[in-house]
Amino acid sequence: MDIFREIASSMKGKNVFISPASISSVLTILYYGANGSTAEQLSKYVEKEENMDKVSAQNISFKSMNKVYGRYSAVFKDSFLGKIGDKFQTVDFTDCRTIDAINKCVDIFTEGKINPLLDEPLSPDTCLLAISAVYFKAKWLMPFEKEFTSDYPFYVSPTEMVDVSMMSIYGEPFNHASVKESFGNFSIIELPYVGDTSMMVILPNKIDGLESIEQNLTDTNFKKWCNSLKATFIDVHIPKFKVIGSYNLVDTLIKLGLTDVFYSTGDYINMCNSDVSVDAMIHKTYIDVNEEYTEAAAATSVLVADCASTVTNEFCADHPFIYVIRHVDGKILFVGRYCSPTTN
């Protein structure tokens, strides 16, 4: 969650959408070739050996592509290449066709949702380029009826409001909790997909209460909040939205302590005999949330059957909120902030 917090704090008032799973995967690739303090700093983000194929099931599609492109004139070590397999490719960064080929690969992988990934020429001095792309599409376990979607006010701030297309579902059982913390009070709800993934939505009680929650959004806190969920009959209102994100993660990761990973400070002796540096780490994302499904690119948890009460509550996301798409095992696939309906 720390990468999301850092990006969110530097992009106040803007929508944010990233895939921690994808970012972790590409940092793991760099870790395989790192040495010394570079390897030590990257180890915090090393992805555990997990089979992401289990995320995919009927009505769900999740796939992740991570690539590291190295300059063709450099000689990369067999030990490094053996660990990453087809995730690595040597290219000529001075050839304009290289960018076209990379963009086409990502475009096909994300089914046209991210194009282009690289929208400007690379420096002729580029030695290494790390990219990540993710595609996710899943149907809601309980779809929103299109006939209930209507224009509804969304409060960007206490004094600013814009109309959005608000999806609604009435009187269904969802896992939900009202949370009280020293830094703010909020509601959290789980909107399950068919299969083993779900979207968690964190909605502050106050229109302008999201920032303090973001600052305290840690893995530990998030797990605690999820464990407090109880099945409740509830009316749910959430906007239809699309968000496109584009990030060069280098500065963000340096701020998080990866000071010896990028540029000339990186020690990748286990990757290549010659000096190489990681000059860019591009992360582009796309998400489309509508009545039938969620489609996401970067590049259902079990619902408790017993409800304690038949009293219907309401969860109305009519002001800025955080959303997290996760697998039933707790792995976070995506995390985002929706606060500005007019920017995407």
Curated annotation (Swiss-Prot):
Gene3D superfamilies: Alpha-1-antitrypsin, domain 1 (2.30.39.10), Antithrombin, subunit I, domain 2 (3.30.497.10), Helix hairpin bin (1.10.287.580)
Molecular function GO terms recorded: serine-type endopeptidase inhibitor activity
Site label Reactive bond, positions: 306-307
UniProt entry keywords in alphabetical sequence: Host cytoplasm, Protease inhibitor, Serine protease inhibitor
Pfam families, sorted: Serpin
SMART domains: SERPIN (SM00093)
PANTHER family linked: GH10112P-RELATED (PTHR11461:SF211), SERINE PROTEASE INHIBITOR, SERPIN (PTHR11461)
Function: Viral serpin that inhibits both cysteine and serine proteinases involved in the regulation of host inflammatory and apoptosis processes. Major anti-apoptotic protein which inhibits both intrinsic and extrinsic pathways and strongly cleaves host CASP1 and CASP8 but is a rather poor inhibitor of host CASP3. Prevents the proteolytic activity of host interleukin-1-beta converting enzyme (ICE) and ICE-like enzymes. Can also block apoptosis through host tumor necrosis factor (TNF) receptor.
Protein name: Serine proteinase inhibitor 2
Annotated organism of origin: Monkeypox virus
